[in-house]
């Protein structure tokens, strides 16, 4: 059974991100566009809470139900919410195209109802040596966010 979800990002940057998963064992396809980012890499994560009442701050930390250290999307030991970076060309629109095998739209660890956050700085993927590398990837301020909601198929 296919599950689809969508996230409308608001804040200093704006965008729409779509999620699609064919079944519980398939990767999640993440596609969309974010507008207003400065040229360069920007951390892109699923955060624990679907609470944006205090802007992106109330979304909490990265979604990490297993208590792992922060890492790259290709790492087996990482937060479930660690989706790495999106790259802005500086022309306004940044395309999002990710296929991820760890996040899911099914079951107790579903990302539906949680928040996507776009950060100001590059995610160092847990390898930067900064005191925040193993928790946030030292990705900086939260520029925009939105709650991931289920879609009609």
UniProtKB/Swiss-Prot annotation:
Pfam families: Sod_Cu. Cu cation binds at residues 45, 47, 62, 119. The keyword Disulfide bond applies. Its EC number is 1.15.1.1. The keyword Metal-binding applies. Keywords: Antioxidant, Copper, Cytoplasm, Disulfide bond, Metal-binding, Oxidoreductase, Zinc. Gene3D superfamilies: Superoxide dismutase, copper/zinc binding domain. SUPFAM superfamilies: Cu,Zn superoxide dismutase-like. Zn(2+) binds at residues 62, 70, 79, 82. It catalyses: 2 superoxide + 2 H(+) = H2O2 + O2. GO terms for cellular component: cytoplasm. Binds 1 copper ion per subunit. InterPro entries: SOD-like_Cu/Zn_dom_sf, SOD_Cu/Zn_/chaperone, SOD_Cu/Zn_BS, SOD_Cu_Zn_dom. It comes from the Eukaryota. GO terms for molecular function: copper ion binding; superoxide dismutase activity. Disulfide bonds join 56-145. Its cofactor is Cu cation; Zn(2+). It is found in: Cytoplasm. It is an enzyme of class 1 (oxidoreductase). Homodimer. Belongs to the Cu-Zn superoxide dismutase family. Destroys radicals which are normally produced within the cells and which are toxic to biological systems. This is Superoxide dismutase [Cu-Zn]. It comes from Ceratitis capitata (Mediterranean fruit fly). The gene is Sod1.
């Amino acid at each position: 059974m296919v599950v689809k979800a969508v996230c409308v990002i608001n804040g200093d940057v704006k965008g729409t991100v779509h999620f699609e998963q064919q079944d519980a064992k398939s990767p999640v396809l993440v596609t969309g566009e974010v507008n207003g980012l400065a040229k360069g890499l920007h951390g892109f994560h699923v955060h624990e809470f679907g609470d944006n009442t205090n802007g992106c701050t109330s979304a909490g930390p990265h979604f990490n139900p297993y208590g792992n250290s922060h890492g790259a999307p290709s790492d087996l030991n990482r937060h479930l919410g660690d989706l790495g970076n999106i790259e802005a060309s500086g022309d306004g629109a940044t395309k999002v195209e990710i296929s991820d095998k760890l996040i899911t739209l099914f079951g107790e660890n579903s990302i539906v109802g949680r928040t996507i956050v776009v950060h100001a700085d590059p995610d160092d993927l847990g390898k930067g040596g900064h005191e925040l590398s193993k928790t946030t990837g030292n990705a900086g301020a939260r520029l925009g966010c939105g709650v991931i909601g289920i879609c009609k198929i």
